[in-house]
Amino acid sequence: MATDYYAVLGVRRDASQDEIKKAFRRLARELHPDVNPDPKTQERFKEINAAYEVLSDPQKKQVYDLGGDPLSQNGGGGAGGFGQGGFGNFSDIMDAFFGTASQRGPRSRTRRGQDAMIRLDIELDEAAFGTTKDIQVDTAVVCNTCNGEGAAPGTSAQTCDMCRGRGEVSQVTRSFLGQVMTSRPCPQCQGFATVVPTPCPECAGDGRVPSRRTLTVKIPAGVDNGTRIQLAGEGEVGPGGGPGGDLYVEIHELPHSVFQRRGDDLHCTVTIPMTGPRPSAPRCLETLDGMEEIDIRPGTQSGQSVPLHGRGITHLRGGGGRDLIVHVEVTTPGKLDAEQEHLLRELAKLRGEERPTGQFQPGQQGLFSRLKDAFNGRS
């Protein structure tokens, strides 16, 4: 009767990969030969390693769940045809016919790791002038217990006895071309040519463990929302101690209380009371990099803008800074008393905008009428 690998690890048949890995790690720590030298315990340790080798590999697990034993010598065999054990596609047929399939060779256990990405929030002034930030990232790193090899301390990977280190097995298959010899990856070693009889208890044979690291990232001036900064080799370390992938830091610019960014231009609004200092008086505006004097000329209307050239965001790829656009908003009093209304009428007369009754033309309003409408909330 076939071994019940689920029972060996003490997990349900619908257990997730995470549950299987946790169960193996727990048992491996209890039954490891360095901890418990009892010969019976060592046999039990071999059983949990075999169970984990099958259940942690999707292909082997599928074969096992269908009633096969992927660790047996004949477990990976198959009948002819185009299904399992036969030809997967036309290139397999041509490889078999011309004898090229056996030239594939074993796969390397050392592979490049996956890329990773995190989001980093920065302030507007940091985006404008650049900065340096320390970030924390959670990625896979090389297991220090096995140095990325995946084997328990004191053990090592062994040559696969099924394929004898070739990484592939051959079989005779019948097709419309007749009987041909075809090769495919060894089901026992998955094409690696070696097997790990005793996986590392710390990383469960993966050669990697999760870790939190602190990295320093330099943010150049001019970055915008969505800009990705690449840190080569700082992503996930590869299986078998392979080189790490890249880490991408995606910039997210936080809203500013005063300035709004549109491309590389900055925009802000300056409020000027109608009854305040004369419009031509210079005013000081606090920008991202200090105080700036702006000159609002006489006659400037609400809604007009004053550009400050070169006071925007420096372009990411170099060059001068763009503009800071100052939008002027002229405010009027919310309510007029009798004296204020009289003064406005006098001003309208001086400007020649108050006309006698009967001379008013549709579509034309004097200064007093326009201001009064504004004060009363009418447009």
Curated annotation (Swiss-Prot):
Residues where Zn(2+) 1 binds? 143, 146, 200, 203
One matching Pfam family: DnaJ_C
Q: Which cofactor does it need?
A: Zn(2+)
Q: Where are the CXXCXGXG motif repeats?
A: 143-150, 160-167, 186-193, 200-207
Zinc finger boundaries on the chain: CR-type: 130-212
What is the free-text note on the cofactor? Binds 2 Zn(2+) ions per monomer.
Question: Which Gene Ontology BP annotations are present?
Answer: chaperone cofactor-dependent protein refolding; DNA replication; protein refolding; response to heat
Q: What is the predominant subcellular site recorded for this chain?
A: cytoplasm
InterPro entries, from UniProt?
DnaJ (IPR012724), DnaJ_C (IPR002939), DnaJ_domain (IPR001623), DnaJ_domain_CS (IPR018253), HSP40/DnaJ_pept-bd (IPR008971), HSP_DnaJ_Cys-rich_dom (IPR001305), HSP_DnaJ_Cys-rich_dom_sf (IPR036410), J_dom_sf (IPR036869)
Residue spans of biased composition, Basic and acidic residues class: 370-379
MF terms from GO for this chain are: ATP binding; heat shock protein binding; unfolded protein binding; zinc ion binding
In which residues is Zn(2+) 2 bound? 160, 163, 186, 189
What keywords is this UniProt entry annotated with?
A: Chaperone, Cytoplasm, DNA replication, Metal-binding, Repeat, Stress response, Zinc, Zinc-finger
Location in the cell reads:
Cytoplasm
Show where the J domain sits. Answer: 4-68
**An example Gene Ontology CC term for this record:** cytoplasm
**Domain of life of the organism in this record?**
Bacteria
> Polar residues composition bias: which ranges?
358-367
Q: Which SUPFAM superfamilies match?
A: Chaperone J-domain, DnaJ/Hsp40 cysteine-rich domain, HSP40/DnaJ peptide-binding domain
Q: Where is this region: Disordered?
A: 351-379
How this chain assembles, per its entry, is:
Homodimer.
Q: What does this protein do?
A: Participates actively in the response to hyperosmotic and heat shock by preventing the aggregation of stress-denatured proteins and by disaggregating proteins, also in an autonomous, DnaK-independent fashion. Unfolded proteins bind initially to DnaJ; upon interaction with the DnaJ-bound protein, DnaK hydrolyzes its bound ATP, resulting in the formation of a stable complex. GrpE releases ADP from DnaK; ATP binding to DnaK triggers the release of the substrate protein, thus completing the reaction cycle.
Provide the family line.
Belongs to the DnaJ family.
Domain observations: The J domain is necessary and sufficient to stimulate DnaK ATPase activity. Zinc center 1 plays an important role in the autonomous, DnaK-independent chaperone activity of DnaJ. Zinc center 2 is essential for interaction with DnaK and for DnaJ activity.
Query: Which protein, by its recorded name, is this?
Result: Chaperone protein DnaJ 2
Which organism encodes this protein? Streptomyces albus G
Traced from the root, the source organism's taxonomic lineage reads: Bacteria, Bacillati, Actinomycetota, Actinomycetes, Kitasatosporales
